[in-house]
Amino acid sequence: MSSPLPAPSAEALAHSGRLQAHIRDQVRAAGGAIPFSRYMELALYAPGLGYYSAGARKFGAEGDFVTAPELGPVFAECVASDVFAQLGGRFDFIELGGGSGAFAEAALRFLHARDALPAHYRILEPSADLRERQMERLREALPPAVFNRVGWLDGPPERGWRGFLFANEVIDA
């Protein structure tokens, strides 16, 4: 059966081979087995090799897939509007896996225009490459006072917080 998908380039095949070798090395170093969670961590985030860490564009028309935030601001505006309606004044917004930063940009612009910004907007992003892209996008797109509310997390908050946890497409990954 033939596939309608394009064949990977020689460069893509070589990259895939390097990632496979890295994962094999990790399995060997662990005595022959690793948990599935570790396998997924390596496949997605191994520095310079993982799907989200190798520098290739993943989102939008030139990427591998398109999510609602990449199509325009409406989705983020609807979510932000509802979050503000439910939580009112001071709250924290935590986004898991911020992708290109499109959702954060649209949500923060929308809330800023209504004088309804969260106390903090945090993005939990394991990919250093995506983190850098998000920072660049948001720094350029948002007024400094809005950008200064944005921060990046290395893990879930360890203390209690009042706010909203948003995870678009995370379960799919």
Residue positions per predicted region:
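Rossmann-like AdoMet
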Residues: 2-96, 100-161
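A short SAM/SAH-binding and catalytic strip from SAM-dependent methyltransferases
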Residues: 156-173
